[in-house]
Amino acid sequence: MDTHHQRFGKIIRGRRAAKGLGQEALADKAGLHRTHVSLLERGKRMPTLEVVRKLAAGLGTTMASLMGELEAGGEGKTAGSGGEATPKAV
């Protein structure tokens, strides 16, 4: 089972690839270093809220979208999007 770190990394990698961006291009757009993006994508680091904000901006999306996908289990699913995945009731 993937950790939150690994799932978040897969989400960032998938979103970046879907936009046709390399790690360097995303890093430039987000104001981050390429190695930081690499560490995040490999699940070696969990980002701060500020880094999530920067990544979202670099990917042309929102923090809520990224976090919603994380909570929905990653793999391109978003909470409440056509019944693909929904967050667990608390």
Model-derived regions: residue spans:
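Conserved hydrophobic/aromatic packing and binding residues within compact polymer-binding modules
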Residues: I12, L26-A27, V37-L40, L66
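Short, charged recognition helix plus adjacent turn
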Residues: A57, M67-V90
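Short basic helix-loop element that most often maps to the first helix and adjoining turn
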Residues: K10-K29, A89
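Helix-turn-helix DNA-binding elements, focusing on the entry/boundary residues of the two helices
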Residues: I12, Q23, R34, L49-V52
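DNA major-groove recognition helix of helix-turn-helix/homeodomain DNA-binding modules
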Residues: E50-S65
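A detector for short, charged/polar N-terminal pre-domain segments
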Residues: M1-R7, K77
